[in-house]
Amino acid sequence: MKQLESFQIPRIVIFGPGAILKTPLVVSELKAGRILVISGKSATTAYANQVAQLLSNYSVDVVRYNEVDLSKSSYDLVIGVGGGRPIDMAKVYSCVHKKPLVVIPTAASHDGIASPYVSYTLSQKLQTYGKIVASPVAIIADTSVILSAPSRLLKAGIGDLLGKIIAVRDWQLAHRLKGEEYSEYAAHLAVTSYKIAATNARRIRNFTREEDVRVLVKALIGCGVAMGIAGSSRPCSGSEHLFAHAIELRLQEESSEAVHGELVALGTIIMAYLHGINWRRIKKIAEIVGLPTTLKQAGIDADMAVEALTTAHALRPDRYTILGNGLSREAARRALEDTELI
């Protein structure tokens, strides 16, 4: 008999043009007094200030993500407004102080807008706080705001979605070979998000219409729900993400402009090759969208990619994937050559 299961998923989701104006309605349901709004450092700060103005009946502090004082626990609610970093820091604050979390994304470049988990690199920096898990109680996705984000970030969102087919294949492999717990429902949600990206790629690739963003946001929110049901990021993060994380760790010391979803798309092509999936189709979808499909286009050195492929498995030794105990340098280079990434 299976043990008792529990999971947390967002209970309020509002998306569409002008959705940000519904923020006071959402907050009123959460009965908050003091509110911390965490913003980015760029143009997205304007949206955080707009949220603060909409909540003028409350006591609101707007703080940039890199200036948040995690020792301060006097807020009743935390709202993350912006891209990955402010939303991740809002999750950290929510988790550390057990406060409800509202997410208001200004871009849709990855599934972090709806997931309970923070980026790998941030989780490594904050290990003293333990495992960071904070599911948003509400997501307010204003598609008119997200539509104004750089198209590169929106295309990266498709890249992140393409990776779900690999994450689920890795999960199934771990279930068969290692006896890992597997949720068919969570896996189905993740694969559905992949299919939405794959089948709509040509239609939405330019992101010139609100409905293009709506398709992307729905799929990314579906991924967040899948992770909430699974109780881990397993259905949405496999070997393709390990490769991306390995590259990101190596680029930390450089002034790289690499975008997470772009790296995931490259990792997806490589891991599809290793899994025996039709990697050419995935690469074609990436080309249609306008994602990098070679290491050169992504600004990544071939030796760095080889090194990432041989060490990525060690980033999460508890997560079995197609990488197994690691690729040899010869196998890694062959995979890059056969998929024409180099």
Swiss-Prot record:
Membership in a protein family: Belongs to the glycerol-1-phosphate dehydrogenase family.
Catalysed reaction, written as an equation: sn-glycerol 1-phosphate + NAD(+) = dihydroxyacetone phosphate + NADH + H(+); sn-glycerol 1-phosphate + NADP(+) = dihydroxyacetone phosphate + NADPH + H(+)
Binding site for Zn(2+): 160, 241, 260
GO cellular component term, pick one: cytoplasm
Localization terms from the record: Cytoplasm
Positions contributing to substrate binding: 111, 160, 245
Keywords: Cytoplasm, Lipid biosynthesis, Lipid metabolism, Metal-binding, NAD, NADP, Oxidoreductase, Phospholipid biosynthesis, Phospholipid metabolism, Zinc
InterPro entries: G1P_dehydrogenase_arc, G1PDH, Glycerol_DH
Protein name in UniProt: Glycerol-1-phosphate dehydrogenase [NAD(P)+]
EC annotation from Swiss-Prot or TrEMBL: 1.1.1.261
Primary role: Catalyzes the NAD(P)H-dependent reduction of dihydroxyacetonephosphate (DHAP or glycerone phosphate) to glycerol 1-phosphate (G1P). The G1P thus generated is used as the glycerophosphate backbone of phospholipids in the cellular membranes of Archaea.
Binding-site list for NAD(+): 84-88, 106-109, 115
Listed cofactors: Zn(2+)
GO molecular function: glycerol-1-phosphate dehydrogenase (NAD+) activity; glycerol-1-phosphate dehydrogenase (NADP+) activity; metal ion binding
One GO process term, biological-process aspect: glycerophospholipid metabolic process
Record's cofactor remark: Binds 1 zinc ion per subunit.
Pathway: Membrane lipid metabolism; glycerophospholipid metabolism
Database matches in Pfam families: Fe-ADH_2
Keyword NADP tagged: yes
Subunit structure: Homodimer.
Domain of life: Archaea
Cited PANTHER family: GLYCEROL DEHYDROGENASE, GLYCEROL DEHYDROGENASE 1
Gene coding for it: egsA
Membrane spanning residue stretches: none
Lipid biosynthesis found in the keyword field: yes
